[in-house]
Amino acid sequence: MDCTAAVDIEVDNVLPTRRSLRVAVVTETYPPEVNGVAATIARAVQGLRERGHELQLVRPRQDKHEAATQDERFAEVLLRGLPIPRYPQLKMGLPSKRALLRHWSSHRPDVVHLVTEGPLGWSALQAATQLKLPVVSDFRTNFHAYSQHYGMAWLRNPIMSYLRKFHNRTLCTMVPTAGLRGELMSTGFKSLRVVSRGVDTAMFDPARRSPALRQQWGVGPQDMVVLCVGRLAVEKNLGVLVQAFQGMQAVDPRVKLVLVGDGPERSALQQRCPSAVFAGLRRGEDLGAHYASADLFLFPSVTETFGNVVPEAMASGLAVVAFDYAAAHQVVRHGDSGLLVPFADSAAFCAAAQRLAGQTAWVRAMGEQARMKACQMDWGRIVEQIETVYVTAMSHHTVTTHHALRPALPLL
């Protein structure tokens, strides 16, 4: 399908700008690490570079032998990091205020973009504030919501207080959906701007469907493959996935479940679903082939700020079953490209999945519509929105640097 004709998607009303900028992007995760934040910020960085901007990428060193990439308009600044508990393949950046003060004093950016709120992000905020640099941020992960899934619900309010303090010290916080903006505004977050997410419709394409891969999974051409992609962790609500799949099996025993991803819940899931395929971490074209070789995408998570896997599945030609919030609310049309159910209603989720068992023709028809919708999610327009947030923040910062308190940006 031709995906060249993009149409408007949900973003604030902003105008693109073509001024070349020096941008420092600070993130505690980046490819080859596999997660939604790493994937989307890497795509944004690529888009900004393609549009002629000069980028500094500030991140933790992923291993002790890693060398920073440097060229004329792109420079990595690699700092100290530690493995994250239970996720040793991921790094948490350590406080690096002094190093950033030194670097930004001699390589001063026009604007600092904080992607994550960890120790590195906080020290970058402090350094940028001390140097009187304009700072914008992203709200990308519902850490406050994760706490209840790890038996630490008492941490929810302190975490939210920290996140609010962090983001309210920046000139603008970008959020991926209007729903999240409303939720955060109601708890005291300020200057929020909707900048959605795009999807790579060349990487995620039904043309990557692989009969050989389906044969490896032990399914025939007409058998339904149900896919879930993401971290195998308790906050992803995977118990509901198992229930939904078992309900589908009761209707059609040939249904196959494939899980792409890894995490601490893998062993428990393998015990509960011995017939499922656990494909582990997949990247690039291999990941695209796994998406395209399935038929239906089940997404039971209730802790997403967006959920990049939803448009990736849709771009791959899969119908989606999801809770009606975040990316699914924004891009899935109920009954046309998938089925949406009320937020956190596990029984409704399982019933929707079971309803599609054996309905191969309907699922395929919704998958075709899903592909058409995904083709409207153009990354070029998203990068334009980010550019304009930068320029607006820079202009406002220049006018108001004498104020001690953070001013609110005018509506874009």
Annotated model-derived regions:
Residues M1-R80, G380, L409-L412:
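N-terminal subdomain of nucleotide-sugar transferases
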Residues R59, V77-R80, R156, M160-R209, ...:
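Donor nucleotide-sugar binding/catalytic pocket of nucleotide-sugar-dependent glycosyltransferases
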Residues W104, L281-R282, A289-A294, I386:
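Short alpha-helical donor nucleotide-sugar binding micro-motif in glycosyltransferases
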Residues G220-Q246:
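Conserved donor-binding/catalytic core segment of Leloir-type glycosyltransferases
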Residues R266-E285:
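Nucleotide-activated donor-binding/catalytic signature segment of Leloir-type glycosyltransferases, i.e.
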Residues V302:
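Aromatic "clamp/platform" in nucleotide-sugar-dependent glycosyltransferases that forms part
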Residues A319-A322, V332:
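Short hydrophobic beta-strand element within catalytic cores of glycosyltransferases
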Residues H334-G335, L339-S346, R355-T360:
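Conserved acidic donor-binding segment of nucleotide-sugar-dependent glycosyltransferases
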